[in-house]
Amino acid sequence: MFIKASLDKSKVVKIRKKYGIPKGNITYTDLDKPAKPLFSAKHKLVGKPDYIVKRKEGHIPVEVKSSSVEIPYKSHIMQLAAYCLLVEDVYNAKVPYGIIVYGDRQFKIPYSNILKTRLIITIDEMRNCLRTNGRLKEKA
């Protein structure tokens, strides 16, 4: 499933410059106008990355944040990992990394098997917590 971006060339140039979005074909955007959420039946996960850029090495989700930081927040890395998982499943495509943009700085986050596993464990823990009415289980 491919969701075509409906942006004219001049707007794409401005967006790329403003957010430091890498070269490639923007195949999805949610920042300029609301886009249809991506849904993975396999992982029962839904989300809307700000951009997806198709490059030679694969599909790259891009998440734009309004804050400025020295290092990315762990929660933002997990959010980006969820977008990588969605793109991998929905587009049936390789996702080598994602990008988080903060102000004038961006971070390229490798989408590794370790990050994917941490994400799936975190999602499972969150679902378990919801099933137990929000109570965390005591660890021995």
What are these language model-derived features?
Residues 45-70, 79-85:
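Conserved catalytic cores of phosphodiester-cleaving nucleases, focusing on short active-site segments
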Residues 75-97:
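Metal-dependent nuclease catalytic cores in nucleic-acid-processing enzymes
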Residues 32-46, 89-140:
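Metal-dependent nuclease catalytic regions and adjoining charged, substrate-binding loops involved
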Residues 69-73, 108-110:
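A generic structural signal for short coil/turn motifs at secondary-structure boundaries
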Residues 71-75, 119-120:
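A short, polar/proline- and glycine-enriched secondary-structure boundary/capping micro-motif
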Residues 6-8, 21-23, 54-57, 95:
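Short hydrophobic/aromatic-rich motifs at helix boundaries and adjacent loops
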Residues 1-18:
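N-terminal signal-anchor transmembrane alpha helix of single-pass membrane proteins
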Residues 24-56, 75:
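Active-site metal-binding core of divalent-cation-utilizing nuclease and nuclease-like domains
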